[in-house]
Amino acid sequence: MTKEIAFKKMPFLLMAVCAAVLVGCDEEEAPAPKQPQAAAVVEESGEECLQRAIDKLSGEGKDIEAADAAAKKALELMPDSAEARLVDGQAAYMKKEYKRASADFDAVVAEKSLPAALRAEALVSRAVVEIAQNEFDTARLTLFRALHLDHRNAAAWYHLGLLSRNTYQFDEAAVEQFEMAARLSAPGDPRTMKLSREVIPAIRASLAAAAASRPGAAKRDAGAAAKLIAEAEALRKKRQIRAAMKKYEAALAADPFSYPAARELAYLVSLNDKSADGVDKALRAYRVAIDLRPVVQDNYYAAAQLAYANKRWATAVSILDRAIAHDPENHKTLDLYIAALQKAGRDKHLNAWKAYRQELK
């Protein structure tokens, strides 16, 4: 799951010696009958139970049942300990007791007096539970909440990267998220090394291959496109908008990687052709612009706004889903996303998104 909470090792040596004396003596060395009977075991403290649970959850001596018992005991002895509740949640997760795990993590998140980083850890753990139950949309939002509390939480970035790559196919966002995870993790960590050496290069190679296979990519003519764009700009100044639109369209055909051609074509068509075919053409051009510059939020917003205005609610939601992957705290994007969710009848997560939006104020 998430990185383990570090606790200082307790001084077990003296306790172990005492226990050996109490339970290891011979019959002849036993106390006289009239003397009080010595205890057979030494009661562990809450901190010791907690450390034992952590030890049993990881490492060579991993034992989930023993960890679970120790975690429950630690929580019983320290019911107000956020750390004990987090470890109990981890043990519950390992046993696939997801309801109990979620309750533990939610309790930590709800305690607003706790450090933001600790609450973020609980949210990441909560998201992992949700992923295990295939609640991917819920998990993504939970991870956004974690990053709002602690932008340097490497585990949150890592799990977002997994969701972007494996569930949503937002590969550009996955690269950004995995890079953040690698940057914030220990350099020698095996997962960090795998991200940097294998995962990120593989996604980049896939993106490059997809770009190379784009229609017209092999015969692109950037020079011709630049000339056509200049002609389009001259026509716009003369208010010959229809002619300018044709020039931008020709420029994009000459060079499918021309971001200015895609962006300006989308903008002009959306303003000047209100027919269904015009909306389709504008949305296609916006998608090209988005593919070429996936971090530019304005293109997502303009495309989604166009879809929303034409009652294409599901299209607006789809566009904004991708926008949010790159910038989950953009207020304007979120407001339109929530409105589109409501219009599309996507009520399952609507209240959760509204609550998240309130957290950002």
Task: Write out the residue ranges for each language-model feature.
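Bacterial signal peptide processing site
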Residues: C25-E28
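Alpha-helical segment of the N-proximal tetratricopeptide repeat
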Residues: V42-K73, L77, M94, G223-K246, ...
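Helix-start (N-cap) detector for alpha-helical repeat units in TPR-like alpha-solenoids
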Residues: S45-E47, A82-E83, A116-A120, A154-A155, ...
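Structural signature of tandem alpha-helical TPR/SEL1-like repeats
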Residues: G61-A70, K95-A107, Q133-T142, Y168-Q177, ...
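Canonical tetratricopeptide repeat
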Residues: V87, E121, S125, H159, ...
